């Protein structure tokens, strides 16, 4: 149905790329959909391959975004960069000398699991501070319900002030991590996208 809707013949479909966050849903975050746990037992690649009869490539969402950046974005300008992806969780990915670096277990750049201190001084995983889930929780605590990024731009002045305060906290939280990445990897750039 989707191919028909966008006007692409099935004969032109040569493969499918799927981007999924790592550790879904083991890394419990607020505002997850009720059936999020199904991703622990669903292997999407064979399901799509059997249905569409094309190769299926499944990749971590931050790594997939980084590969896209390498092909179509600032990765064409920078050969060594670190990519920070802020979505429902927090991810990262590393490119060294024009090559995506996966690490020994394919998990390089896993920022969200690092520890950091929140505004009260308590140690937490930094994705519980720097992620859209964390932002939505901060807004919800003030009575503002948001469930998608496009809803953020239409918020009133109080909502925008909460977002601005969250950005300040996010910057403070990421600072030590970004300094460590700069010292250890020395990238030409750190790209932060959502």
Across the structure, where does each feature detected by a protein language model lie?
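Flexible loop/hinge segments that line or gate small-molecule binding clefts
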Residues: 42, 94, 156-157
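Glycine-rich phosphate-binding loop and adjoining helix at the ATP-binding site
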Residues: 2-15, 19-80
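Short secondary-structure boundary segments
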Residues: 20, 86-88, 194
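ATP-binding/phosphotransfer module of carbohydrate and carboxylate kinases, centering on a glycine-rich
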Residues: 1-14, 27, 50-54, 72, ...
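Glycine-rich phosphate-binding loop of actin/hexokinase-like ATP-binding domains
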Residues: 74-130
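Conserved sequence/active-site signature of Rossmann-fold short-chain dehydrogenase/reductase
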Residues: 23-24, 89-90, 135
